[in-house]
Curated annotation (Swiss-Prot):
Domain of life from the UniProt record: Eukaryota
Classification lineage: Eukaryota, Metazoa, Chordata, Craniata, Vertebrata
Domain PH, chain residue ranges per copy: 776-892
Gene3D superfamilies, per the entry: Arf Nucleotide-binding Site Opener,domain 2, Pleckstrin-homology domain (PH domain)/Phosphotyrosine-binding domain (PTB)
GO CC terms: membrane; ruffle membrane
Organism of provenance: Homo sapiens
Protein name: PH and SEC7 domain-containing protein 4
Region described as Disordered: 25-71, 87-149, 195-239, 340-362, 388-533, 546-581, 1004-1056
Sorted UniProt keywords: Cell membrane, Cell projection, Coiled coil, Guanine-nucleotide releasing factor, Lipid-binding, Membrane, Phosphoprotein
Ranges of biased composition (kind: Polar residues): 88-99, 128-137, 466-476, 486-502, 548-567
Biased composition (Acidic residues): 207-220
Coiled coil stretches, renumbered: 921-976
Length: 1056
């Protein structure tokens, strides 16, 4: 820093090496004269122009005091050495670095300071630090050469520093930085005071000079005092120095002081607006002891910016040289230049190129590569009120990693515009060491391959200062962050333009190409570096490394790169490995795509591929859900659309697996609504249960809104869901139930008649009869019905025992009761809406004449499969016989074979459950089945009669025996009737039921012809009153008479 007397915090040995091996040496014969100040245009007569030198990035040299009258040569390496800027009235001034000390000695007393060439400071804006009274054109020809002892001393001290840095590199101890700093302070050489002065020296402006005054000065003041044509601006290397330095293997892969960055320089200080921060007692700038007053600091001179005169304020030189490490196994000296090596060790700057200057054919090389000297900083170096802290967490193994992974990109040096045609230059290889700080001419791709650490810390881009206040990110680790799409890592990036890649130098013979575009794998974007734009070309080998196109959002105006999520409207990458080691290739995606598009699958078959508990099924489910876009939808709306795509079937845990994948997808599409996937999954399952409770066949009170909210308390990752959200979901499901998807084939079929009866009239809601309108109609007519017994033989209550007249229709195996006075003779007509009472199934039923009922004539009874008993009265006896025959024929034709009897340890008799579904067999098969059932029932009845219970046995056993006997006798009679009717049906030549009835009547009449016999009589009519004629009147005693006056009050006592 200019005028800063603080001791260095971080030593960098190559700064001292550059200090003594730089441009102070005379060029080799046949070589273009070397300049200490690089300019864009040829030199012109010096006018009033202020030359503002901006301190280089991490390379400020702590120089011991110099006597008066002592002048030192320009030292260091330079990149752009083609000429001086036109000396115009131009002011390059910014605020002086805040870390500069106020007690800096004024310029004068014969002490002048050289500008140390900093290749890393080649793209940064220059500060106008020259005072109005600075000497102009003080660099005069004929300055004396530096003596030979200076070169020997340089080699000696450089060897010591290089050895120390090698020790630090081998030990791989990060904490050695502080100890090395103290050691390097002692190793700093004290230049001899009797060195001959060089007219190319000039002193830095005073420290206490205000930046505002500098910026207001007229242009052209304080111009640098070196001219290109000066023959003695740099001493020439002798044979001894060349053999001692360039042939020494110790320095072939030595750390370099700076890396060239085209017109860029990292400022280590903050602007004056934050000057108060750095002056604290704990600041390293204030803890360093000042240098003697009779000395001035060496100022590293840098070249002007990319053509724009805007200066950057708040930049200063670091108070110490920072070491930069290179792999010692790589030799990139003159051999690499001679062989045309494609790349040199990463991070080398133009200082190395200058060391190759003694070669006759060598010339100063123009480097366009942006170098990244530093890896990860230990503290925030941003100008936002943060002092410069010592670097920490330096990883030596990260510095020495070879084999860069960054693609090699050839850049057209924009500084070729600044060269003169008469200075041919060789192109030397240069490799970029990437770091998470970007420059206007180099911005990394978001998904370019990772690069290894090339330096101890990140270097911020000056372009961030041009656009605003640079934000230097703090990195906690000692290793460079890797370039990935992770948002947490991409937050360390400064976006300014192009992509950082391995950069190459252009040969001197090429003409400048301003305005060329950056080309990277088919994606072109102009480099935003001011007036001159470099050209980047990818080689064939580099196309294999650059696999991802540049993100168009990475522009200099954006402070941070926008990391793209891998799942925004896209499926997950197919290269991920599953838990069992199976690679998730395109097999799962192809199957999911076919399931989503229903290519060869039905909606009812999709769930079977998503609900299994294995890795492949989970992968298919994840890929399947990736086709759904739930962004901006509510949870119930997204669930409705999802349930329309597939039939959610299977067991509870299988459905839960599918719903979990739905929850993951919904949370991915709407990450801000719910805190986690579990909360979405919990609410999804609650909605499914609510739909079942509100719209299912549940018995009891439905769930209320308050109960729904209460049941979800504490299930939102320990908290509660918003009540407004739960209320909206509740009323959405209550007003409209969740519709299930159905196959298209099912919707195309004609719906079967499913009568919707009131719930109160359905005594057995789970007993659903097959009501097919396509089955034939056996008979219809007017019948009076009376319910005598309910299911299981229970007596029907008194209020339901009355006789009712219905238009009865026997269709298939169902007996329908319709309204009277309407025509119901149409075949295939749906009876929905015409039924006035519950239909009765006649499967496994038996109709017989009701001989025991004498109150009404022409009455027959019907015993159903569930042991109900109905009484029907027909208009005539013929109608009664016809109804009995046709009801039994329908039962024999459509009754399926019974299930096997249940097996249990109870001795209590339980009637077997008979199937409700219709039989699918033919009449012959039905006949054989009924014969087998008849034989089985007859055998069971015979066995029961053989095993009679004991007369003195318990009453329960006797009752069980009686019930079993009645059932077996009824089953035997029923199957006998079925067999008889089916035999007559099979023997009937026509399908007409009328002809079948006539044949059946003839067979029944021949067998049932009455025989002549005596009638049984009794002496006392009162013994058998049931056999007495109905017209006989029997006078009873008053005590035997019953009146309803006494019974009704007793039965209705509680109701009165």
């Amino acid at each position: 820093m200019m005028g800063d007397y603080r001791l260095p915090d971080h030593p960098q040995p190559m700064e001292i090496l550059n200090l003594y091996l730089g441009d102070s040496l005379e060029p080799h014969p046949g070589e273009c004269p070397r300049e200490t100040c690089s300019h864009e245009d040829p030199p012109e007569p010096f006018e009033e122009q202020t030359w503002a030198t901006d301190p280089p990035e991490p390379t400020r040299q702590n120089v011991p005091p110099w006597g008066s009258g002592v002048e030192l040569t320009h030292l260091g390496s330079w990149v752009h050495q083609d000429g001086l800027e036109p000396c115009q009235e131009q002011t390059r001034a910014t605020d002086p670095p805040e870390s500069t000390r106020q007690d800096a000695p004024p310029w004068g007393s014969g002490v002048e300071l050289t500008h140390l060439g900093s290749p890393s400071a080649q793209r940064e804006h220059r500060q106008n630090t020259a005072s109005p009274g600075s000497p102009v054109n003080s660099h005069l020809p004929g300055s004396p050469k530096q003596n030979r002892s200076t070169s020997t001393q340089v080699v000696f001290w450089a060897g010591i520093l290089q050895a120390q840095m090698c020790v630090l590199d081998l030990e791989e101890e990060l904490e050695k930085t502080e100890g090395l700093k103290a050691g390097l302070k002692c190793c700093l050489p004290t230049p001899p005071v009797d060195l001959p002065g060089d007219t190319g020296l000039h002193s830095s402006p005073p420290e206490n000079e205000d930046s505002g005054e500098d910026s207001s000065e007229p242009e052209g003041e304080g111009q640098a005092w070196l001219r290109e044509g000066t023959p003695d601006s740099s001493p020439q290397w002798g044979a001894e120095e060349e053999s001692m330095f360039f042939s020494n293997p110790l320095f072939l892969a030595s750390p370099c002081s700076e890396n060239s960055a085209s017109g860029e320089c990292f400022s280590w200080g903050a602007s004056d607006s934050h000057a108060g921060v750095r002056t604290g007692p704990e600041s390293p700038a204030t803890l360093e002891p000042p240098l003697p007053e009779d000395t001035v600091l060496w100022e590293l001179e840098s070249e002007p910016d990319l053509g724009d005169g805007a200066a950057i304020s708040g930049h200063c030189t670091p108070p110490f040289p920072v070491p930069i490490y290179k792999p010692h196994s790589i030799c990139w000296a003159s051999v690499a230049a001679a062989e045309g090596a494609p790349a040199a060790p990463p991070g080398h700057g133009e200082s190395e190129g200058d060391r190759l200057g003694p070669a006759p054919s060598a010339a100063p090389c123009v480097d366009e590569a942006l170098t990244w000297e530093s890896g990860c900083v230990g503290s925030d170096l941003g100008p936002a009120a943060h002092p410069v802290q010592p670097w920490a967490s330096l990883s030596p193994e990260g510095w020495q990693r070879g084999g860069p992974f960054w693609p090699q990109v050839t850049l057209n040096s924009q500084d070729r515009d600044e060269r003169e045609g008469g200075h041919p230059q060789e192109s030397l290889p240069c490799t970029l060491a990437p770091c998470p700080w970007r420059s206007p001419a180099s911005s990394p791709e978001p998904s370019s391959p990772e690069s290894e650490s090339r330096g101890p810390g990140p270097r911020p881009s000056p372009a961030s200062s041009q656009e605003g206040s640079p934000q230097l990110q703090h990195h906690s680790s000692g290793i460079l962050p890797k370039w990935t799409l992770d948002a947490s890592q991409s937050s360390l990036l400064e976006t300014d333009g192009e992509q950082p890649s391995s950069l190459k130098k252009k040969e001197a013979g090429e003409a400048p190409k301003p305005g060329e575009e950056v080309k990277s794998e088919g994606t072109a974007r102009p480099a935003e570096t001011g007036d001159v734009q470099p050209d980047i070309h990818l080689t064939s080998a580099e196309h294999e490394n650059l696999r991802t196109p540049m993100n168009s959002s990475w522009l200099p105006g954006s402070p941070m790169p926008q990391a793209q999520s891998p799942e925004e409207g896209q499926r997950p990458p197919a290269g991920d490995k599953l838990a069992n080691g199976v690679r998730n290739n395109k097999v799962a995606w192809n199957l999911a795509s076919r399931l989503y598009r229903l290519e060869g699958f039905r909606k009812s078959e999709v769930a079977a591929y998503l609900q299994k508990n294995n890795d492949f099924s989970r992968a298919v489910a994840e890929e399947y859900l990736s086709f759904f876009q739930f962004g901006g939808q509510s949870l119930d709306r997204a669930l409705r659309s999802f349930l329309q795509a597939l039939v959610l079937s299977g067991e509870t845990q299988e459905r839960e697996r599918i719903l979990y994948q739905f929850s993951r997808r919904f949370h991915h599409c709407n990450p801000g609504i719910f805190p986690s996937v579990d909360s979405v999954h919990t609410l999804t399952c609650a909605i499914m249960l609510l739909n079942t409770d509100l719209h299912g066949q549940n018995i009891g009170k439905s769930m209320s809104c308050q109960e729904f909210i209460t049941n979800l308390n504490g299930l939102r990752d320990g908290g509660n869901f918003p009540k407004e959200l739960l209320k909206a979901l509740y009323w959405s499901i209550r007003s409209e139930k969740l519709e299930w998807a159905v196959d298209e084939e099912d919707t195309a079929r004609p719906e079967k008649a499913q009568p919707s009866l009131p719930a109160g009239k359905m005594s057995k809601p789970f007993l659903q009869l097959a009501q097919d309108p396509t089955v034939p109609t056996y008979k219809q007519g007017i019948l009076a019905r009376k319910m005598h017994q309910d299911a299981d033989g229970k007596k029907t209550p008194w209020g339901k025992r009355g006789w009712k007249m219905f238009h009865t229709l026997l269709r298939g195996m169902v007996l329908y009761f319709l309204k009277q006075g309407e025509d119901h003779c149409l075949e295939g007509e749906s009876l929905v809406g015409q039924m006035v009472d519950e239909p009765v199934g006649v499967h496994h039923s038996l109709a017989t004449p009701a001989t025991h009922y004498t109150k009404k004539p022409h009455v027959f009874q019907l015993r159903t499969a569930d042991w109900r008993l109905y009484l029907f009265q027909a208009p005539t006896a013929k109608e009664m016989s016809s109804w009995i025959a046709r009801i039994n024929l329908a039962a024999a034709t459509h009754s399926a074979p019974p299930f096997p009897a249940a097996v249990g340890s109870q001795r209590r008799f339980v009637r077997p459950i008979l199937p409700v579904g219709p039989a699918q067999s033919s009449l012959e098969e039905q006949h054989r089945s009924h014969e087998n059932c008849l034989d089985a029932a007859a055998d069971d009845l015979l066995d029961l009669q053989r095993n009679l219970p004991e007369r003195r046995g318990r009453g329960r056993e006797l009752e069980e025996h009686r019930l079993r006997k009645e059932y077996l006798e009824y089953e035997k009679t029923r199957y006998e009737t079925y067999v008889q009717l089916l035999v007559a049906r099979l023997h009937c030549p026509s399908d007409a039921l009328d002809l079948w009835e006539e044949q059946l009547g003839r067979e029944a009449g021949g067998t049932r012809e009455p025989k002549l016999s005596l009638k049984k009589s009794h002496s006392s009519p009162s013994l058998h009153q049931d056999e007495a004629p109905t017209t006989a009147k029997v006078k009873r005693n008053i005590s035997e008479r019953r009146t309803y006056r006494k019974i009704i009050p007793k039965r209705n006592r509680n109701q009165l």
